[in-house]
Design a protein with these regions (language model features):
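TOPRIM fold recognition
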Residues: 80-179
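TOPRIM metal-binding catalytic domain and adjacent DNA-binding surface shared by DnaG-type primases
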Residues: 1-24, 164-179
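Contiguous hydrophobic segments
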Residues: 7-26, 45-57, 128-160
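Phosphate-handling DNA/RNA-contact segment within nucleic-acid enzymes
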Residues: 14-104
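Generic structural signal for bulky hydrophobic/aromatic residues embedded
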Residues: 1-2, 31, 81, 151
Length: 179
């Protein structure tokens, strides 16, 4: 999903079984010790479902800001894009955990929302803004995309395409100069 080694320390490879089938996936831990799991074929959770909270590059007592995401792939995309961000990263892991999310957001004075650009994301955003009117919605950054990860993927694709075009132009110029 366009992620780089910057975020690997936030993940763990989890091995699990569904019936007789043995699988593995990247895992992102939640605050109850459960895991959100993703691989090419599977999206689910292991043990208890809950929100995930990661404290990045700061002393939580001094820095009370948080960024909020629906899923952990979007959170990892944010960390990829902003590796020096200082604050909390809260991942809902399911919109059904909205009330749990709102309860946890009471610990922060500065809230930044990066929720999906779909109906459930809109509902969550409106509910959080109703409870925390000072929260800031940042979905305009990726307004043409479903979520922050899709935005990152399209940005990376554009960079790769430009690089390939430059390489092709260089090769063509090299060939022409040899003639």
């Amino acid at each position: 999903r366009g992620l780089w080694p910057t975020v690997y320390s936030l993940l763990k490879e989890e091995h699990f079984a569904i019936g007789e089938k043995k699988l593995y996936a990247i895992g992102f831990e939640n605050i109850s010790g459960g895991w959100e799991l993703r691989n090419q074929f599977y999206k689910g959770s292991l043990l208890k479902k809950d929100i995930s909270v990661v404290n990045l590059n700061n002393n939580l007592e001094k820095n009370k800001n948080v960024v909020v995401f629906e899923g952990f792939i979007d959170a990892l995309s944010f960390v990829e894009m902003k590796p020096f961000f200082r604050g909390g990263v809260l991942v809902m892991n399911s919109i059904s955990l909205l009330n749990r999310t709102k309860e946890h957001l009471k610990n922060y004075s500065e809230i930044h929302l990066f929720l999906d650009n779909d109906k459930p994301g809109e509902i969550c955003k409106n509910e959080i803004l109703k409870s925390f009117p000072e929260a800031k919605d940042h979905s305009e950054i990726y307004a043409l995309h479903k979520d922050l990860n899709d935005y990152l993927l399209s940005k990376n694709k554009t960079k790769i395409e430009k690089q390939q075009q430059q390489e092709q132009k260089f090769k063509q110029e090299q060939q022409e100069s040899e003639i």
